[in-house]
A protein has these predicted regions:
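Conserved P-loop
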Residues: 57, 86-162, 211
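Interdomain "pre-motor" coupling segment immediately N-terminal to P-loop NTPase/helicase cores
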Residues: 9, 13, 18-68
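N-terminal pre-Walker A segment at the start of P-loop NTPase domains
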Residues: 71-95
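Short hinge/gating elements
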Residues: 10, 26-30, 75, 104, ...
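Short, Asp-centered acidic motifs that coordinate Mg2+ and/or phosphate
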Residues: 165
Length: 251
């Protein structure tokens, strides 16, 4: 016949209470030492289970977001960042722009930390229970075209709309025709004024017509994406180049 403890382990396994199962012995000992009553014991044990599940959800959100690599805000060397980024980053770190459904556009030279900032904000958002999608504009446009061909575009749109934060990296690396520009504009417009989107681009707004050959569409896209948005000019000496120079000096 099973002991009460073994029975508890079985119930915990059946109910997928992993922390409950792992922490039972330790919590029983602590309860005996502290002379806890039953409610105190259960509160402690269920608190550990709740903490474990929150951590699992955070890891799952980060994994599902699709970040190409892990980047964190504390890794940024603030004095090496462009001036505008230094000023606005403390406000962005609060993630209020996500709660307010405001966009963030990081534009400027390659290697200045745009993707690092976007990724780091996305990871912090996942850690604070926001749902996040990281994608590049070329990949997103391919997905939109494929969904349209497969007649599943509305399904893709509904999923895209629901994320608390979408990060669209590398806007401007690949040009697109008028149809592609319209598809991208319509897709991004689904979130306008409701959910936050981060755009990283190496092109200033007056050069967007180099990748989308329709001036009217470009004007509409700029207007839609920048309305009440944070616009951060990252045009400065490459952040990556500065890191390389420092490494050489340290040798």
């Amino acid at each position: 016949m099973k002991s009460e403890k073994e029975t508890i382990y079985d119930y915990a396994a059946e109910l997928k209470l992993l922390a409950f199962k792992e922490e039972l012995e330790c919590t029983l000992s602590l309860a005996a030492e502290e002379n806890w009553n039953h409610l105190q014991f259960l509160t402690e044990l269920l608190g550990k289970e709740s903490a474990r599940r929150r951590e699992c959800r955070r890891r799952s959100r980060i994994r599902s977001a699709g970040f190409p690599q892990m980047k964190y805000l504390h890794e940024l060397v603030m004095e090496d960042m462009p001036k505008e980024a230094q000023v606005i980053l403390p406000e962005l770190e609060t993630l209020d722009f996500i709660r307010q459904g405001r966009n963030l556009v990081l534009y400027g030279n390659p290697g200045t930390g745009k993707t690092h900032i976007a990724t780091a904000l996305g990871i912090k958002a996942c850690q604070q229970d926001f749902t996040v999608l990281f994608t590049s504009v070329p990949v997103l446009l391919t997905q939109i075209r494929e969904a349209k061909s497969a007649k599943t575009l509305r399904t893709l749109q509904l999923r895209f709309e629901k994320y608390d934060l979408v990060i669209c990296d590398e806007f401007g690396y690949v040009s697109c025709d008028k149809e592609g520009g319209e598809l991208l504009f319509n897709h991004l417009s689904l979130r306008a004024g409701k959910k936050a989107t981060i755009i990283t681009t190496n092109l200033a707004f007056n050069r967007w017509n180099e990748i989308i050959k329709d001036k009217v569409l470009v004007a509409a896209m700029v207007d839609r994406l920048t309305h009440k948005a944070y616009l951060v000019n990252m045009t400065e000496l490459s952040y990556r180049l500065k890191e390389t120079q420092k490494m050489r000096q340290d040798k």
